[in-house]
Amino acid sequence: MSVNVNRSVSDQFYRYKMPRLIAKVEGKGNGIKTVIVNMVDVAKALNRPPTYPTKYFGCELGAQTQFDVKNDRYIVNGSHEANKLQDMLDGFIKKFVLCPECENPETDLHVNPKKQTIGNSCKACGYRGMLDTHHKLCTFILKNPPENSDIGTGKKEKEKKNRKGKDKENGSVSTSETPPPPPPNEISPPHAVEEEEDDDWGEDTTEEAQRRRMDEISDHAKGLTLSDDLERTVEERVNILFDFVKKKKEEGIIDSSDKEIVAEAERLDVKAMGPLVLTEVLFDEKIREQIKKYRRHFLRFCHNNKKAQRYLLHGLECVVAMHQAQLISKIPHILKEMYDADLLEEEVIISWSEKASKKYVSKELAKEIRVKAEPFIKWLKEAEEESSGGEEEDEDENIEVVYSKTASVPKVETVKSDNKDDDIDIDAI
């Protein structure tokens, strides 16, 4: 699950996202440590080396840190909860990632070890400034500058501007002329010629460049759409699924779209609520016929999924509410059709019948629907009792009596009676 990079922004459509931190505690006793499993992904979203936030945790917690770059293992000694580290990460983002002006995380760090300064530039608003180097992490950053923040970054830009300025003043530079040597205090980039030949989309207006830009933008937009859909609320995702199913029906291809519909529901992470959408789109007053027609569609959602079956029952209530006059008396038959089609299990139906909910229809209608369903519910319970009773009888029939030769025989003692008349003479019998 992803969260906003700037968690003070509650907008769900905020474009800057990062994965939620995952922490795993390993070891025991003095060797206990917390491995931040997805630190590489988090750091990538922040445009910072993964060692920076890990070291920041160590500075804030007063704990030692370990970096295994080859195996992507970033460790903080001690046992620490993921939520605690996530809150602590907000402090790192505020100090070392967000722009002080626009509060967007589109910043780059520019480290100058000689001057012991860390510059900060924002690509969103153009802000340029210096970071406060009093934090302990700054010492680590000065010793380990980010790869994209070499000292010559600003100088490269200056050299590029100088070259462009000279081109404007002197026209195009001829190949026979030797370019002027760089100033003694600056180091010319080793691939300056290659940099000049890089594509600059801001200046290239050819049809090929425009087409290439549009292709990349469209591909990127598709990826954003897929990820953005999962960031929406459940209600919004259900509405997307509803529009998808409705479109299939309007196009006349709903009968063969059962696999596509369940795949879309899984993509939107609302598979259990699929039957609720299907009932609204596919069912009307002819529901008994439609259950048979669209059985395969519902079975893909309801098979061995009790939650989906409950949503199917709630969907049925909604259909009855829309066609109450035609369907209210047919409730037992409709439930029997769904039961026979293996869309509903006994346990789910009985549980649903025991409590009326006003979440989808009025409380009065929910109660009335359950009253009308009583004959079928009663039949279900009786059938269940009969089946359980039959099983007990079968068990009794299958019991095998085993006689033991070593079993002890109880000893019978004769009791003498005081009444002599009651004595029986065995010889006289």
Curated annotation (Swiss-Prot):
Gene3D superfamilies linked to this entry: 1.25.40.180, 2.20.25.350, 3.30.30.170
SMART domains cross-referenced by the UniProt entry: eIF2B_5, eIF5C
Residue ranges occupied by any W2 domain in the UniProt entry: 231-390
Residue stretches of biased makeup (Pro residues): 178-187
Keyword Phosphoprotein: yes
Keyword Transferase: no
Compositionally skewed regions (Acidic residues) per UniProt: 194-207
Sites marked Arginine finger: R15
Main location: cytoplasm
Keywords: Cytoplasm, GTP-binding, GTPase activation, Initiation factor, Isopeptide bond, Nucleotide-binding, Phosphoprotein, Protein biosynthesis, Ubl conjugation
Cellular localization per UniProt: Cytoplasm
Signal peptide: none
Annotated positions binding GTP: G27, K28, G29, N30, G31, I32, K33, T34
GO cellular component: cytosol; plasma membrane; synapse
GO biological process: regulation of translational initiation; ribosome assembly
Region (Disordered): 143-216
Family matches, as PROSITE patterns: W2 (PS51363)
Covalent cross-link Glycyl lysine isopeptide (Lys-Gly) (interchain with G-Cter in SUMO2) as placed by the record, residue numbers: K411, K416
List of residues that carry Phosphothreonine: T225
Function: Component of the 43S pre-initiation complex (43S PIC), which binds to the mRNA cap-proximal region, scans mRNA 5'-untranslated region, and locates the initiation codon. In this complex, acts as a GTPase-activating protein, by promoting GTP hydrolysis by eIF2G (EIF2S3). During scanning, interacts with both EIF1 (via its C-terminal domain (CTD)) and EIF1A (via its NTD). This interaction with EIF1A contributes to the maintenance of EIF1 within the open 43S PIC. When start codon is recognized, EIF5, via its NTD, induces eIF2G (EIF2S3) to hydrolyze the GTP.
Name of the protein: Eukaryotic translation initiation factor 5
Organism: Mus musculus
Recorded name of the encoding gene: Eif5
